[in-house]
């Protein structure tokens, strides 16, 4: 990820954050925030499903641009969700950086060990 990419995500997140106290009649994002957890999370599920369907379409000769568009929708709604739970893209980027260089198997083993320690085991 380039600095420009990270900057784009952070700028978009700032705009989303600014909608938290906005008028739900004037802003789609404000409306999602106003509706609460279930509306935000339902939107994530819908967008994730659309990503899966678009990916399957690409394998059948569909347009890759449709998949990119659906992923953009999912990322956008994930940014809304992060903001809704008082998190930011920087939190996700930090976690990805922490995992960088670890194999998926190693990362999963470390996560399980941490969970056991947190649960007193």
UniProtKB/Swiss-Prot annotation:
Keyword terms: Amino-acid biosynthesis, ATP-binding, Cytoplasm, Histidine biosynthesis, Hydrolase, Nucleotide-binding
SUPFAM superfamilies: all-alpha NTP pyrophosphatases
Swiss-Prot/TrEMBL catalytic activity: 1-(5-phospho-beta-D-ribosyl)-ATP + H2O = 1-(5-phospho-beta-D-ribosyl)-5'-AMP + diphosphate + H(+)
Keyword Hydrolase applies: yes
Keyword ATP-binding applies: yes
Superkingdom of the organism of origin: Bacteria
Subcellular location(s) of the protein: Cytoplasm
Coiled-coil residue spans: none
Enzyme nomenclature, EC number: 3.6.1.31
Signal peptide start-end: none
One biological process term in Gene Ontology: L-histidine biosynthetic process
GO cellular component: cytoplasm
Functional pathway: Amino-acid biosynthesis; L-histidine biosynthesis; L-histidine from 5-phospho-alpha-D-ribose 1-diphosphate: step 2/9
MF-aspect GO terms: ATP binding; phosphoribosyl-ATP diphosphatase activity
Family membership noted in the UniProt record: Belongs to the PRA-PH family.
Protein name, as recorded: Phosphoribosyl-ATP pyrophosphatase
Source species: Burkholderia cenocepacia (strain HI2424)
Lineage: Bacteria, Pseudomonadati, Pseudomonadota, Betaproteobacteria, Burkholderiales
């Amino acid at each position: 990820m380039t600095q420009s990419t990270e900057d784009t995500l952070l700028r978009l997140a700032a705009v989303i954050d600014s909608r938290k106290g906005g008028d739900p009649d004037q802003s789609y994002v404000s409306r999602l925030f106003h509706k609460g957890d279930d509306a935000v999370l339902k939107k994530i599920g819908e967008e994730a499903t659309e990503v899966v369907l678009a990916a399957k379409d690409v394998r059948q000769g569909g347009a890759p641009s449709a998949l990119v568009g659906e992923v953009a929708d999912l990322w956008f709604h994930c940014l809304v969700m992060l903001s809704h739970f008082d998190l930011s893209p920087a939190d996700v980027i930090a976690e990805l950086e922490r995992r960088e260089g670890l194999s998926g198997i190693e990362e999963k083993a470390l996560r399980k060990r941490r969970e056991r320690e947190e649960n007193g085991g």
